[in-house]
């Protein structure tokens, strides 16, 4: 019933959000990276800027701006989840502070990792098109991995939102259409690997 669904509404929402992020964020991060660097590519303005500042300082400024925008995106997503719960009158309590911090921290980490991979492509190739193509491909691969065995997702970085998620389906009653959710432990090794990969991609573009 509708009342029963509201008692597990946040579980359903947080189960679905990583899938939505897998669809939207690879392309969104590609657009963000390409637009940040494309501003300087057009007209060869980097050659002028390099007379005033170092290449690394210019890249650091672009990366910092990108991280700030990603943080804003994640905060808006977090606020949106609260707003949805309020407007739809969810009866299930919002996830505990530690659980919510982990979920949004994972979202931020994966976004940053994808962003730095796209920024690296844009800087190396001086062309935003390859980054956009990789973003589209990443969306398709990430979504495809969601319907494959769990181990496949570990080889698809664009879809790390899903294996990092702690909300899983425990049971689905086909007759009543009732879904039961469960919470699994935090995926710390994968989160650490995501942060390390983001750092490697950043320094690869930095140097």
Which stretches of residues belong to each language-model region?
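Transmembrane alpha-helical segments in integral membrane proteins
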Residues: 25-41, 115-129, 194-207
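Membrane-interfacial segments
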Residues: 38-41, 45, 84-92, 125, ...
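Tryptophan-centric aromatic hotspots in well-structured domains and transmembrane helices
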Residues: 45-46, 120, 158-160
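Secretory targeting signals
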Residues: 1-29, 33, 60-125, 143, ...
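Terminal transmembrane helical anchor/hairpin motif
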Residues: 2-12, 132, 137-207
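Helix-loop-helix units of permease transmembrane domains in multi-pass membrane transporters
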Residues: 34-68
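Alpha-helical transmembrane segments and their helix-entry boundary regions
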Residues: 58, 130-132
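Short amphipathic alpha-helix initiation/capping segments at coil-to-helix junctions
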Residues: 110, 127-130, 154
């Amino acid at each position: 019933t509708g009342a029963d669904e509201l008692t597990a509404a946040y579980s359903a929402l947080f189960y679905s959000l990583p899938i939505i992020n897998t669809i939207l964020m690879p392309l969104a991060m590609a657009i963000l990276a390409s637009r940040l660097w494309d501003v300087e590519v057009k007209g060869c303005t980097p050659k002028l800027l390099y007379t005033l500042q170092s290449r690394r300082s210019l890249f650091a400024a672009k990366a910092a701006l990108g991280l700030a925008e990603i943080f804003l995106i994640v905060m808006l997503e977090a606020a949106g989840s609260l707003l949805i719960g309020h407007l739809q009158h969810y009866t299930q309590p919002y996830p505990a502070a530690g659980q919510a911090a982990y979920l949004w921290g994972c979202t931020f980490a994966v976004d940053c990792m994808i962003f730095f991979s796209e920024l690296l492509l844009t800087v190396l190739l001086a062309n935003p098109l390859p980054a956009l193509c990789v973003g589209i491909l990443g969306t398709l691969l990430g979504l495809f991995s969601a319907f494959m065995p769990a181990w496949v997702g570990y080889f698809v970085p664009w879809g790390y939102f899903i294996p990092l998620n702690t909300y899983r389906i425990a049971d689905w009653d086909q007759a009543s259409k009732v879904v039961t959710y469960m919470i699994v432990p935090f995926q710390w090794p994968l989160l650490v690997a995501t942060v390390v990969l983001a750092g490697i991609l950043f320094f690869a573009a930095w140097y």
